[in-house]
Amino acid sequence: MNIIYLHGFKSNSNSIKGKLLQHYCAKYPEIQVHLPDLNMSPNAAIAYVSGLIESMHDVALLGSSLGGFYATHLVAQHAVPAVLINPAMRPWQLFRELFDEQLPYQVHPKWCLDEADLVQLQQLALPVAQDADKILVLLQQGDEVLDYREAHLSLIHI
């Protein structure tokens, strides 16, 4: 089993959640955890993870925040199972609200969020999550940035 952890916005492949997942799964030699760095444009991130999925067998995704948004697209594209942790459902709107005056916004030394990224995010959005039977959604109140109710309403059919 290969688990690909998709980190959230302003995070990276060394995130605490990813490292905890890797540490926990180390007890199970049949599970390999992959922690790709997704600090790149949305289209590049999707292409990169798609390449990983296509190069492996028995793949599942675990996506947090922006990584959860990416996972919904990747499930539809590759029919792999996914767990979404407080997924961002309309990140282009959220980022515009948070950073509109500051675009381009330096997210990471390797990536500046700009208007083209917001357009890419909107184009990646699905009106309804596809392959809903392959998705488990975990929501928690109290997230400092994301309102769990938005994900709940967007994914209520799952």
Predicted regions located by residue number:
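Conserved alpha/beta-hydrolase "acid-adjacent" motif
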Residues: 144-150
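Active-site nucleophile loop of the alpha/beta-hydrolase fold
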Residues: 38, 84-92
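Gly/Ala-rich beta-loop-alpha elbow adjacent to hydrolase catalytic centers
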Residues: 62-67, 71
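Active-site nucleophile elbow and catalytic-triad environment of alpha/beta-hydrolase enzymes
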Residues: 109-128
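Conserved small/polar residues in nucleotide/adenosyl-binding loops
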Residues: 156-158
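Short beta-strand/loop motif that positions the catalytic acidic residue
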Residues: 137-139
